[in-house]
Amino acid sequence: MNESQITQLAALCNRVLRQNWREGVENGTHYGYTAPSPGHYPWLWYWDSCFHAIIWRHLDPARSRLELETLLASSRDGVIGHIAFLGQPLNLERAMRYNIATRHAPTTSTIQPPALAWAWSMSVGDPRLESKIQEHHDWLRAHRDLEGDNLLWLIQPDESGMDAS
């Protein structure tokens, strides 16, 4: 790619990210995230948000931080579901396809590859300084490292990130 093509690609990426940005307040908490595909995937998705934050770091560092803070805010005792249903309710058809505890659950019950500490280090700073990231890793160790070998067990195939999307 030449410099002109790189500039055009960067402008296109910037436009798509800004177009897909969602911001609001839910349960008294300010949130902001990039919807992977507003029509089909309108909510916050764990590792998509990690990758979005890394890109936002170069375009708008405040959005980068907010994207990851929004992901952390969805944590329940350290578990961060692979989807946080922010901004619009989950319809019945989707509720039947996603692993959720109840129809009105704020997140799925399944996880995605734990890329949060890596994304935080690339986008915000030292992840060891953020206690909720440590809580997340403690939860993963306690509930998904079943043999104590630092390898996480998956409950269903989508948790690997190798799904049909």
Give the residues covered by each predicted segment.
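Aromatic-rich carbohydrate-recognition surfaces in CAZymes
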Residues: 42-68, 73-165
